[in-house]
Amino acid sequence: AGPSATTGVWFGPRL
């Protein structure tokens, strides 16, 4: 779990 690789936030397509 961590920042999304695309948006830089935790609530992204890549948790």
UniProtKB/Swiss-Prot annotation:
One of its GO terms (molecular function) is neuropeptide hormone activity. Both CAPA-pyrokinin and CAPA-pyrokinin(2-15) are expressed in CNS, ring gland and abdominal perisympathetic organs (aPSO) but not in midgut or thoracic perisympathetic organs (tPSO) (at protein level). It is found in: Secreted. GO terms for biological process: neuropeptide signaling pathway. InterPro entries: Pyrokinin_CS (IPR001484). The modification Leucine amide is found at residue 15. GO terms for cellular component: extracellular region. Disulfide bonds: none annotated. Keywords: Amidation, Neuropeptide, Secreted. Its main location: secreted. Belongs to the pyrokinin family. Mediates visceral muscle contractile activity (myotropic activity). This is CAPA-Pyrokinin. It comes from Delia radicum (Cabbage root fly).
